[in-house]
């Protein structure tokens, strides 16, 4: 830091005058230089750690989020709007802001009316409807209180009167009697007290508001109405209402059945209802109870426990009634007499429901009103007096009206079907899998049971106890309490006393004191233990975070729960948790709980319950006799409100878009379908997500700040805007589910009372869209009120003849994201937009009064709607739980509850993991490219070397390493066939690799390098794989071509290969095509001494240093005299076309460096213990000798072509999978596949398998033949021979004259001639298959032929080769015999048929003459005595690159580029000249410019004077031969294009003509003598086959002395060609004679071939045997292959004559008689 400050001061002052400053400046410079060097060195040595960047990324993003959030809070505090948003708040759904939406799914759940709130303190208030029209009149009674609920966003405004509840001292039974059966007083009243009716009436004509519970009601029979849109026929589409059966829907408490709400108005009473659950007993009761002074109060944190008791068990009891979809229904006004198509949504058969009423706002209230209803009916039909069988109630509660029926169950929803309407017949059904939904709901709900965990302890003490198996405690706290109690209690009890029923022994100890019902001893013990072990409320959050099973269970909850059972337990009554569990729902006035009523299974003598025997009594009858306790323990608690949405109605109207006629004018429900749920297609995932987000108890909208922190530290201040006034509220007043809202320290006594009328919630169906598309041609098709989407609700008794149905349309608006402050508009209209494709809307929609939504940018309300907030300043995802408030106060504590989507617990970690995964994928996919760009940039700056860059690219994977690693090979020796001989040499390698970890003496003697040689496809690679599989070692595979890539270091890649091999040792390194890596090096010094690794390594490194080429320097000096433009032109030409010699030299340098690296790795300083090198090549002759010496490749294994037996084994091995026929001629296919490699045989069997699968058979002869043909040949065109055509009918024409038939016969005779001669010649290979239509050979066939020829001619005799040449001309000779009769027709012309055989015969003849020298010994001498045509090689021997340069320049001069253009132009002019009809004139001759170098040379040498150089002032030793002398001219370099050899005819010009004449005459005399000898030696009898052959005497050609030029090097070719022509002619004549002698056999083979088209060897053998047997026995041999001679005088010939006119006119023989001295 001190040095940095000094630097700053110096840079600011810039004063270096003083010595001190100068010294300080130098010191700073030194510090900078050393720091720069150290940092560079550190950066070079340090590795790139991308993980560090990834680890710091979440921290940086989180810090940025913190800064953005602080900025937003600061700007909001100053009243400014902040546009900045953090990364998390923008991208994560946890922090997204959503406006409250009212979707049509809201109406698909069970709703209940909005509870009212009182503004008075005192006794409980009862809310009842009234029929008074003028509600705003003054209060008539003193006890009446005006109730006015605050109006805020989404909540309707209700105004009504309430009355205090009756006095608690009133007789309970009398009140029940007056309430239940006072029919004359009016059924619409809720409570009759003191003969005064308390009413509440709607103040306006608006539709009453609804509030949807966060959970829907479970029901056995629940008909929902959903909406769907689909296309109809005739391009009609509409949204429709459909009823479908759904078995299960969740709720806060299973079994909850809120009743319908009744509101009286001018038009009638609105009554709707929803069914209940089947949860009660078999008895049929309808009892309403009222109690007083119930003081039990429950803690707030027990709500989850009571909500979910036995929820799963109730779900399991519910079954699907009807899985078929219900018929389509439309909510309409029900006709009076139309009952046939009426569908009634009736409740379940056995139901139980309750309803709570509360109205509380101030936390200091002490008295509340609670209503409890318990009812049970058999079915939807009303119960009459006959079905009412409760004798006890009949006595105590006499009926005042015998025709009385419980009207509470008669509220029905009238629905009329639309079966007769064809509009709905073809609609797409909206179906849902109710069974699957039921399974989903069962997984969502949490089962919480409270029972005793005494099973294990009780069984240990008394094995006879069996009733304990029904119970289990899941709460750890209760389990601990019970365990302590049970152990202490069992020690004190006598075990003999509990040998019977343990339950009965507990019941005997129950006591009743002071008319209060106490628990048994077990419960009392538990309460005592609870006092000792306290579970405080403030530990709930910690327990939830710690993962407790029941974090919401504390001491107060358990005490309340146990004390609650006092109301249901009496003396001699078994505790409910020891009996059969039957769910019973009760409302205690404190909090709704789930309890289990006792089931009195056993009758006991002398047991009474308040004087009434219990044997025939149900639990309700027991409760009716019980006098509830007047005093209980008081527990202070507060109930938090539950989230709830408020749906508001408005006066709206629908008008026709064209006529402007009002179709409907009245109340309606406004919806918004921007955010909806796809229940039909994604009900599984959507339902789970919906529950987790909106319904889960861990949702912040349900779990409030007080529950999270266990206390409310800071009071929230919210501001709610109303249309008339502004009020501040303590909290957002969301309707609570429970009837109490008390303060934490509040204590009160609860009055229980009866209520005859209950407000039921109703089921409100809806649709999703306001616009109904229709065609413009029929706009009035549905313009009536019946087709307006909405709902009809019956508001009176079903049997009431004056019932009224009110229709409420469902209208949809879309809420925009903008709001404007514009003056309020009393009335405005919002028109819907037209549909595309010719559709328009039916209605125009408008709203009267103040709208709830801003659906227009022009007309807007001044009201600023509240924003839905949750979890502090953040807003959660979309929900229909509306906290309709806007936080305007600062200093509000931000908190985040612990839930599944919490940022503190999960979001940050998940986002970090997500970011890490994304960045990891980016680094995997694009990291190499980015790193490559970075390295290119660094290399361009000069910091990174090119070689180092290449190494980094290989290490990072940007470039390929050139090898692959196979850690495991599945091939074994059993998977390879025909390698028995090779296995003996490879087993020792397997032994070495398997025992590489052991030390044995002979390990070093085993070969560490093996070279596999052989033709391609013989299985070298497969052999290495099998070896690796047997040795169980990895294999590193590389090829020479993969290392030799341009711009890369092959030596470095090879070094990486062996480094990897040493790490994987023991392993195998397999180098395929090793000849590309180790070709022979030229001009190398061979070491005649013993192997010296040090000297060889030094020699190899010395050879790597190649001298730089001087061609560039000489080229510059050569062109130094020319102009700059010419030089540039030549440079561009040199760039476009590189010098081949220079390029080859560079390639040679790379090749030598790669070979040297390979030699060093094979036998260098570094060892390769456990690494075995395998090399494979098919050209071992090109390998460098240094590679093949011992120590590198110790053993050379030749993998040749498989023999016949091995070929058969390979065919059988690959055919065993599919199978083959039993009579398969394997010997035939073994001979048929001569020359095939193992890979060829495998491919053959694969093709055969495909053919066999198509034929649905095994391998057959046909499939194998098909495989051979597909491998070796391709398709060819076929011609017909015997096809009947019109030419046969014409007698004048001959069928054989047809060209196609002649061609077919040509083919037949050609194939027959080859077949016959192969059997006639002794050493010629026999024909295996003859086809009439020969197929074109493929490249693979040529390779097979090459392999066969190479193996065949390794050792061959002269006679064998001669017969092969004769066999090559057999087909052509047979073709000539066939066409000899058609010489006059012109069809006997020579064809190209059999060109391949002729070419092979010519190559074979050249092989015999040039390589084998069978016929001419002079040819070998002449080839060795060749002379050099010029002295180019001698003069430029040290500069081979100039030879290529001069040859290229010479070609350019002789054939310049303009010459080709001139030729093209000349040819085009010639073509134009030949066109006689063309009227275009001839163009003038185009003049081409001379070459640039020619102009420069002529200007320099001829037309300009020479400019002699100036003399040198320096003394030169030899100025003539010194390059510094300006007058010195270097010697010329000559390149000769012509040959310097002379014509051999001019070599003997010095000889006289007389000598030539004498030599010629002597030769003629010698020929005459030899002719006489031959005439005497041959028989006078001519052969029958040669009679028809006419001798033709051609005129002698006259040659001049100067018409042919022949140099000495051409003499060897003449010497070769002369006997070659004679040998080919003699072979053809031999084939022609043999076929002519066996003409009958040839014709028979042709007939068979034309008939069968394909002849195989078995058929050919049978045909030959048949022809042999058909010959006369006088003839000794079927085939005549020898010319007949006169046996009178025999001469032992050694060499026959080539002909009288040939260079070998006489034969050579040995005269044994002359040798022996005998006379002839």
Curated annotation (Swiss-Prot):
Q: Which InterPro entries match?
A: AAA+_ATPase, ATPase_AAA_core, ATPase_AAA_CS, P-loop_NTPase, Peptidase_M41-like
- Please give the start and end residues of each transmembrane region: 48-68
Query: Which GO BP annotation is one of this protein's?
Result: proteolysis
Give this protein's Gene Ontology molecular function annotations: ATP binding; ATP hydrolysis activity; ATP-dependent peptidase activity; metalloendopeptidase activity
Query: What's an example GO cellular component term for this entry?
Result: chloroplast thylakoid membrane
Entry annotated with the keyword Chloroplast: yes
Q: Where does the protein end up? A: Plastid, Chloroplast thylakoid membrane
Any keyword Cell membrane? no
On the tree of life, the source organism's domain of life is Eukaryota
Domain comment, as recorded: Lacks the zinc protease domain of other FtsH proteins. Also much longer in both the N- and C-termini.
Protein family per UniProt: Belongs to the AAA ATPase family.
Q: What is this protein called?
A: ATP-dependent zinc metalloprotease FtsH homolog
Q: Which organism is it from?
A: Chlorella vulgaris
Tell me the name of the encoding gene.
Answer: ftsH
């Amino acid at each position: 830091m001190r040095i940095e400050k000094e630097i700053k001061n110096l840079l600011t002052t810039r004063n270096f005058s003083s010595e001190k400053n100068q010294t300080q400046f130098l010191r700073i410079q030194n510090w900078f230089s050393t720091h720069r060097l150290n940092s560079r060195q550190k950066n070079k040595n340090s590795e790139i750690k991308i993980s560090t960047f990834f680890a710091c990324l979440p921290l940086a993003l989180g810090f940025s989020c913190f800064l953005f959030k602080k900025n937003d809070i600061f700007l909001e505090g100053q009243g400014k709007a902040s546009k900045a948003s953090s990364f998390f708040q923008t991208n994560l759904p946890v922090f997204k802001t959503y406006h409250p939406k009212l979707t049509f799914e809201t109406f698909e759940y069970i709703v209940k009316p909005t509870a009212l709130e009182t503004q008075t303190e005192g006794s409980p208030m009862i809310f009842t409807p009234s029929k008074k029209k003028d509600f705003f009149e003054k209060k008539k009674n003193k006890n009446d209180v005006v109730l006015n609920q605050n109006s805020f966003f989404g909540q309707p405004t209700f105004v009504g009167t309430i009355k205090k509840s009756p006095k608690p001292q009133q007789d309970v039974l009398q009140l029940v009697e007056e309430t239940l059966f006072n029919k004359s007083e009016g059924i619409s009243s809720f409570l009759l007290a003191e003969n005064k009716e308390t009413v509440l009436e709607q103040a306006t004509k608006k539709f009453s508001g609804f509030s949807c519970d966060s959970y829907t009601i479970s029901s056995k029979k629940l008909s929902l109405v959903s909406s769907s849109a689909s296309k109809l026929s005739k391009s009609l589409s509409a949204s429709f209402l459909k009823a479908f059966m759904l078995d299960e829907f969740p709720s806060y408490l299973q079994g909850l059945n809120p009743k319908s709400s009744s509101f009286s108005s001018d038009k009638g009473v609105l009554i709707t209802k929803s069914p209940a659950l089947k949860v009660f007993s078999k008895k049929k009761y309808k009892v309403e109870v009222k109690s007083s002074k119930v003081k039990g109060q429950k803690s707030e944190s027990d709500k989850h426990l009571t909500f979910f008791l036995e929820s799963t068990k109730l779900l399991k009891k519910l079954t699907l009634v009807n899985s078929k979809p219900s018929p389509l229904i439309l909510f309409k006004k029900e006709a009076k007499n139309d009952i046939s198509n009426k569908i009634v949504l009736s409740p379940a058969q056995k139901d139980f429901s309750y309803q709570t009423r509360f109205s509380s706002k101030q936390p200091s209230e002490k008295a509340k009103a609670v209503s409890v209803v318990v009812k049970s009916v058999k079915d939807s039909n009303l119960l009459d007096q006959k079905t009412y069988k409760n004798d006890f109630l009949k006595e105590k509660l006499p009926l005042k009206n015998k025709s009385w029926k419980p009207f509470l169950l008669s509220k029905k929803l009238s629905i009329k079907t639309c079966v007769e309407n064809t509009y709905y017949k073809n609609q797409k059904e909206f179906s849902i899998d109710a069974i699957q939904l039921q399974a989903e709901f069962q997984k969502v709900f949490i089962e919480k049971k409270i029972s005793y965990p005494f099973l294990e302890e009780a069984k240990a003490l008394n094995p006879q106890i069996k009733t304990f198996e029904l119970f289990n405690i899941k709460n750890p706290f209760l389990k601990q309490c019970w365990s302590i109690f049970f152990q202490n209690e069992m020690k004190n009890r006598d075990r003999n006393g509990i040998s019977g029923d343990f339950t009965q022994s507990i019941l005997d100890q129950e006591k009743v004191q002071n008319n209060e019902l106490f628990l048994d001893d077990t419960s009392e013990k538990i309460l005592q233990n609870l006092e000792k072990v306290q579970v405080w409320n403030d530990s709930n959050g910690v327990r939830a975070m710690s993962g407790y099973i029941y974090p919401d269970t504390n001491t107060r909850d358990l005490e309340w729960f146990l004390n609650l059972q006092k109301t249901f337990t009496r003396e001699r009554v078994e505790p409910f948790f020891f009996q059969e569990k039957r769910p019973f729902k009760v409302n205690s006035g404190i909090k709704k709980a789930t309890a289990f009523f006792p089931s009195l299974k056993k009758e006991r003598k002398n047991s009474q319950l308040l004087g009434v025997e219990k044997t025939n009594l149900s639990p309700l009858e027991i409760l009716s006799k019980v006098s509830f306790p007047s005093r209980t323990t008081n527990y202070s608690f507060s109930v938090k409100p539950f989230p709830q949405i408020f749906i508001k109605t408005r006066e709206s109207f629908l008008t026709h878009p064209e006529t402007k006629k009002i179709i409907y004018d009245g109340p309606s429900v406004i919806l918004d379908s921007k955010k909806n749920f796809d229940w039909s297609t994604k009900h599984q995932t959507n339902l789970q997500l919906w529950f987790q987000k909106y319904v889960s108890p861990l949702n912040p909208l349900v779990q409030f700040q007080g529950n999270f922190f266990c206390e409310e530290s800071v009071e929230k201040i919210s501001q709610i805007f109303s249309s008339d006034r502004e009020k501040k509220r303590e909290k957002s007043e969301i309707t609570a589910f429970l009837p109490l809202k008390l303060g934490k320290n509040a204590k009160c006594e609860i009055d229980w009372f009866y209520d005859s009328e209950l407000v039921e919630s109703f089921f409100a169906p809806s649709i999703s869209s306001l616009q109904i598309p229709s065609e413009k041609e029929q706009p009035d098709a549905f313009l009536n009120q019946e087709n307006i989407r909405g709902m009809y609700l019956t508001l009176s008794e079903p049997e009431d003849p004056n019932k009224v149905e009110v229709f409420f349309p469902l209208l949809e608006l879309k809420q925009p994201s903008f709001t404007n402050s514009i003056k309020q508009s009393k009335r405005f209209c919002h028109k819907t937009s037209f549909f595309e494709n010719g559709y328009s809307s039916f209605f125009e929609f408008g709203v009267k009064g103040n709208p709830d939504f801003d659906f227009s940018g022009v007309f807007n309300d001044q009201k600023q709607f509240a924003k839905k907030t949750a979890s502090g300043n953040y807003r959660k995802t979309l929900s229909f739980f509306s906290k309709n408030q806007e936080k305007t106060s600062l200093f509000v504590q931000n908190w985040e509850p612990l839930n599944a989507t919490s940022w503190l617990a999960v979001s940050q970690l998940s986002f970090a993991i997500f970011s890490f995964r994304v960045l990891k994928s980016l680094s995997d996919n694009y990291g190499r490219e980015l790193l490559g760009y970075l390295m290119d940039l660094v290399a361009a700056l000069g910091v990174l070397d090119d070689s180092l860059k290449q190494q980094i690219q290989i290490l990072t994977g940007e470039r390929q390493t050139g090898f692959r690693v196979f850690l495991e090979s599945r091939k074994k020796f059993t998977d390879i066939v025909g390698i028995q001989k090779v296995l003996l040499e490879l087993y020792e390698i397997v032994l070495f690799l398997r025992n590489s970890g052991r030390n044995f003496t002979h390990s070093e003697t085993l070969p560490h390098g093996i070279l596999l040689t052989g033709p391609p496809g013989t299985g070298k690679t497969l052999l290495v794989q099998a070896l690796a599989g047997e040795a169980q070692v990895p294999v590193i595979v590389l090829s020479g071509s993969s290392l030799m890539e341009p711009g890369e270091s092959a030596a470095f890649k090879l070094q990486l290969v062996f480094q990897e091999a040493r790490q994987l040792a023991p392993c195998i390194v397999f180098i395929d095509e090793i000849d590309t890596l180790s070709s022979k090096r030229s001009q190398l010094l061979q070491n005649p001494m013993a192997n010296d690794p040090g000297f060889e390594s030094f020699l190899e490194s010395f050879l790597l240093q190649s001298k730089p080429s001087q061609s560039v320097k000489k080229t510059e000096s050569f062109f130094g005299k020319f102009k700059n433009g010419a030089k540039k032109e030549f440079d561009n030409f040199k760039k476009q076309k590189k010098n081949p010699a220079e390029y080859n030299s560079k390639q040679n340098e790379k090749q030598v460096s790669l070979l040297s690296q390979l030699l060093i790795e094979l036998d260098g300083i570094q060892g390769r213990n456990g690494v075995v090198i395998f090399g494979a090549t098919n050209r071992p002759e090109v390998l460098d000798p240094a590679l093949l010496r011992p120590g590198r490749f110790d053993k050379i294994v030749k993998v040749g072509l498989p023999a016949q037996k091995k070929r058969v084994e390979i065919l059988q091995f690959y055919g065993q999978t599919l199978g083959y026929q039993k009579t398969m001629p394997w010997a035939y296919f073994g001979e048929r596949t001569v020359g095939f490699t193992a890979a060829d045989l495998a491919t053959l069997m694969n093709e055969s398998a495909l053919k066999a699968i198509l034929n649905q058979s095994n391998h057959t002869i046909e499939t194998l033949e098909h495989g051979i043909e597909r491998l070796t040949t391709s398709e060819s065109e076929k011609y017909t021979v015997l096809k009947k055509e019109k030419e046969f009918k014409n007698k004048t024409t001959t069928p054989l004259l047809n060209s196609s038939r002649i061609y077919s016969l040509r083919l037949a005779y050609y194939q027959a001639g080859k077949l016959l001669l192969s059997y006639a010649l002794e050493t010629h290979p026999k024909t295996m298959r003859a086809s009439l239509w020969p197929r074109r050979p493929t490249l693979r066939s040529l390779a097979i032929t090459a392999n066969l020829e190479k193996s065949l001619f390794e050792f061959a005799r002269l006679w064998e080769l001669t017969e092969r040449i004769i066999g090559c001309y057999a087909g052509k000779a047979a073709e000539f015999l066939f066409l000899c009769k058609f010489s006059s027709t012109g069809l006997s012309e020579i064809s190209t048929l059999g060109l391949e055989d002729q070419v092979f015969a010519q190559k074979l003849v050249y092989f015999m003459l040039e390589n084998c020298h069978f016929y001419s010994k002079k040819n070998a001498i002449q080839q060795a005595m060749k002379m050099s045509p010029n002295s180019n090689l001698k003069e430029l021997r040290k500069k081979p690159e100039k030879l290529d340069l001069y040859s290229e320049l010479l070609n350019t001069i002789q054939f310049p580029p303009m010459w080709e253009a001139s030729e093209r132009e000349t040819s085009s002019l010639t073509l134009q000249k030949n066109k006689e009809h063309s009227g275009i004139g001839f163009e003038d001759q185009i003049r081409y410019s001379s070459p640039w170098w020619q102009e420069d040379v002529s200007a320099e040498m001829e037309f300009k004077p020479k400019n002699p150089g100036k003399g040198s002032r320096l003394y030169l030793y030899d100025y003539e031969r010194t390059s510094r002398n300006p007058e010195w001219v270097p010697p010329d370099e000559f390149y000769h294009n012509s040959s310097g050899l002379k014509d051999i005819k001019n070599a003997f010009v010095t000889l006289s003509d007389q000598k030539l004449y004498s030599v010629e005459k002597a030769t003629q005399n010698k020929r005459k003598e030899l002719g006489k000898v031959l005439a005497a030696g041959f028989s006078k009898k001519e052969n029958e086959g040669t009679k028809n052959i006419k001798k033709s005497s051609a005129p002698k050609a006259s040659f001049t002395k100067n018409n042919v030029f022949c140099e000495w090097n051409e003499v060897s070719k003449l010497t070769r060609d002369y006997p070659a022509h004679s040998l080919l002619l003699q072979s053809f004549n031999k084939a022609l004679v043999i076929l002519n002698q066996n003409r009958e056999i040839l014709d028979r083979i042709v007939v068979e071939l034309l008939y069968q088209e394909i002849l195989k060897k078995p058929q050919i053998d049978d045909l030959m045997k048949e022809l042999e047997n058909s010959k006369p026995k006088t003839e000794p041999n079927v085939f005549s292959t020898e010319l007949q001679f006169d046996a009178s005088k025999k001469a032992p010939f050694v060499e026959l004559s080539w002909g009288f006119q040939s260079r070998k006119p006489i034969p050579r023989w040995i005269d044994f008689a002359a040798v022996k001295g005998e006379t002839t």
